[in-house]
């Protein structure tokens, strides 16, 4: 009896050991998922989201480790590093980063900022996290990110994230500090040249490393999902690259910014609105950023349109890179925040998603999406018949031998009395930026003036020899760039479009503007539709 039981017990014991072994391998992932379910930060209404928030791309959590999904059987590998005060690298307990599947890792509220991106199986990711001790840096060594069966790759040499004063550049975008002294990166999406591809390329470090993630194009029926803006501008490296190529998209993007009335945590408190306004109402349109209080938040946009360079889409909103919100104020320099894309957008100002883009070797060129109808715009010409369409200012910045052609093949004429479209003389319409590399090479879309007979055509300030903008490589200003908020002062002079009309046409994302009257000049009433 005993001799016949021994083999059976041995077989049972073998199966039992195998079951225990399988359970031991599967338990960590299951436990991670279960803990993520028990304390789900995605249901927290106060949660600060990012373009690649795991609540949008997958499942994340705010505990000591991130959830794991997917499989590494396809040959993908992930190298992660974590530090809590310096540059020490290595994986700490439970600091795994989701790989292969759809899960990402982003953990506000813990003092850490996981910068990781999810892509299809077979691609390799690298994530790094570190505490936001100013002046310190956390780096991650790239243990070669191998992959098989995937078109996305990551060049895994050593890179580091520098935490400095109030903001830092992460490739094409900038990082924004959260209220818990951690940083989150909002990266500028750049589209590969193929218009049929929906793969997004995000710059991760200034050395040119990138992580590719497959994101579907924006769709109005998926309002809370990260997406690419469709074919936009392809570039890598610094925020304003050395050259651009437009692979599609001509429709306008409407961006409406709401200035919150109250001050934000970590920012010097001030009056409800920097320039007046009634209690309980949104602040009137803003014209500058030299205020030490308040915040600006994008509250409108269109997923039917393509994103402009420097903007990203998340949670039903279009965010300009480098912007801050009331819930996510800029720390370190509350007086004058740092912006990656110039000054903030004034309320009710509209922009063209198809800007005229310089093509030159210098990386110092910048694109300024100038709000229409704002200061610095001067009219030129007396309205006599002459050239139609945009004109370029006659200045030393535009050599006489420059070849500037419109989409119809006609050259852009210098701004003057013979032009039917107004212009901005040299030295006006420029913007200041925190980056010294963006001090020259500005191209600014300006509105049509009072003497314009071809309303809606913006003027441009040119500082490069060759301009590209349309899908065919020719300049193609968007007529809607000449629109401004309606008011009695603009009747018969400058074309205007009410915010209500704009938002009704573009199917806005995010909350509707409940009180469009605040965007009109003080004392004017909105005409009933």
UniProtKB/Swiss-Prot annotation:
Alphabetized GO MF terms = protein homodimerization activity
- The residue ranges flagged as biased composition, category Polar residues, are 449-467
- Look up what happens after changing residue 527 to D: In allele 1.11, allele 1.21, allele 1.31, allele 1.32, allele 1.41, allele 1.42, allele 1.43, allele 1.51, allele 1.52 and allele 2.11
Q: Where does the record locate the signal sequence feature?
A: 1-32
Biased composition (Low complexity) is annotated at 58-83, 90-100, 111-175, 189-231, 392-408, 426-441
Sorted alphabetically, the Gene Ontology cellular component annotations on this record are:
cell-cell junction; cornified envelope; desmosome; extracellular region; plasma membrane
User: Can the keyword Oxidoreductase be found in this entry's annotation?
Assistant: no
* Effect annotated for changing residue 408 to A: In allele 1.51
Effect upon mutating residue 410 to S: In allele 1.11, allele 1.21, allele 1.31, allele 1.32, allele 1.41, allele 1.42, allele 1.43, allele 1.51 and allele 1.52
Tissues where the protein occurs: Exclusively expressed in skin.
Output one GO BP term.
Answer: epidermis development
> Which UniProt keywords are present, listed alphabetically?
Glycoprotein, Hypotrichosis, Secreted, Signal
Please tell me whether the keyword Coiled coil is annotated for this protein: no
Residues with attached carbohydrate: 172
- Region of interest (Disordered), residue spans: 38-248, 383-492
- Where can this protein be found? Secreted
Disease field: Hypotrichosis 2: A condition characterized by the presence of less than the normal amount of hair. Affected individuals have normal hair in early childhood but experience progressive hair loss limited to the scalp beginning in the middle of the first decade and almost complete baldness by the third decade. Body hair, beard, eyebrows, axillary hair, teeth, and nails develop normally. HYPT2 inheritance is autosomal dominant. Peeling skin syndrome 1: A genodermatosis characterized by generalized, continuous shedding of the outer layers of the epidermis. Two main PSS subtypes have been suggested. Patients with non-inflammatory PSS (type A) manifest white scaling, with painless and easy removal of the skin, irritation when in contact with water, dust and sand, and no history of erythema, pruritis or atopy. Inflammatory PSS (type B) is associated with generalized erythema, pruritus and atopy.
Q: What does this protein do?
A: Important for the epidermal barrier integrity.
This chain's protein is named: Corneodesmosin
Q: Tell me the organism.
A: Homo sapiens
This protein's gene is called: CDSN
């Amino acid at each position: 009896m005993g001799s016949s039981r021994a083999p059976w017990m041995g077989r049972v014991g073998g199966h039992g050991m195998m079951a225990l072994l399988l359970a031991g391998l599967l338990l960590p992932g299951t436990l991670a998922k279960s803990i993520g379910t028990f304390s789900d930060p995605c249901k927290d209404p106060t949660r600060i989201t990012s373009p690649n928030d795991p609540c949008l791309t997958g499942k994340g959590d705010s505990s000591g480790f991130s959830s794991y999904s997917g499989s590494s059987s396809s040959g993908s590998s992930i190298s992660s590093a974590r530090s809590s005060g310096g540059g020490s690298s290595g994986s700490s307990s439970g600091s795994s980063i989701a790989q292969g599947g759809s899960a990402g890792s982003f953990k506000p509220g813990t003092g850490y900022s996981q910068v990781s991106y999810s892509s299809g199986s077979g691609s390799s990711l690298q994530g790094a996290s570190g505490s936001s001790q100013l002046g310190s840096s956390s780096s991650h060594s790239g243990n070669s990110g191998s992959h098989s069966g995937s078109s996305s790759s990551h060049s895994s040499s050593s890179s580091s994230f520098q935490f400095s004063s109030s903001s830092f550049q992460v490739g094409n975008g900038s990082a924004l500090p959260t209220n818990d002294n951690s940083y989150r990166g909002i990266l500028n999406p750049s589209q590969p040249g193929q218009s049929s591809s929906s793969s997004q390329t995000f710059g991760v470090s200034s050395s040119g490393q990138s992580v590719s993630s497959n994101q579907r194009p924006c769709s109005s029926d998926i309002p809370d999902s990260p997406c690419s803006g469709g074919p936009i501008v392809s570039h890598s490296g610094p925020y304003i690259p050395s050259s651009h190529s437009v692979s599609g998209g001509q429709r306008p993007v409407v961006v409406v910014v709401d200035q919150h009335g109250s001050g934000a945590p970590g920012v010097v408190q001030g009056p409800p609105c920097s320039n007046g306004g009634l209690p309980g109402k949104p602040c009137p349109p803003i014209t500058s950023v030299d205020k030490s209080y308040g915040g600006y938040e994008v509250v409108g946009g269109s997923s039917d349109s393509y994103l402009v360079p420097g903007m990203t889409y998340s949670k039903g909103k279009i965010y300009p890179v480098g912007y801050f919100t009331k819930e996510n104020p800029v720390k370190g320099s509350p007086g004058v925040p740092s912006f990656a894309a110039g000054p903030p957008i004034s309320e009710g100002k509209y922009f063209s998603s198809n800007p005229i883009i310089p093509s030159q070797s210098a990386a110092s060129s910048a694109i300024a999406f100038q709000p229409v109808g704002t200061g610095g715009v001067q009219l030129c010409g007396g309205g006599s018949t002459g050239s139609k369409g945009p004109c370029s200012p006659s200045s030393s910045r535009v050599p006489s031998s420059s070849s500037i052609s419109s989409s119809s093949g006609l050259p852009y004429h210098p701004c003057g009395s013979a032009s039917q479209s107004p212009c901005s003389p040299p030295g006006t319409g420029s913007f200041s930026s925190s980056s010294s590399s963006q001090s020259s090479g500005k191209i600014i879309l300006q509105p049509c003036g009072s003497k314009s007979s071809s309303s809606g055509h913006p003027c441009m300030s040119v500082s490069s020899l060759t301009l590209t903008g349309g899908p065919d490589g020719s300049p193609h200003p968007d007529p809607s760039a000449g629109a401004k908020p309606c008011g009695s002062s603009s009747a018969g002079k400058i074309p205007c479009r009410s915010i209500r009309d704009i938002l009704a046409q573009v199917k806005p994302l995010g909350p509707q503007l409940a009180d469009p009257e605040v965007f009109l000049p003080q004392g004017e009433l909105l005409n009933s539709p």
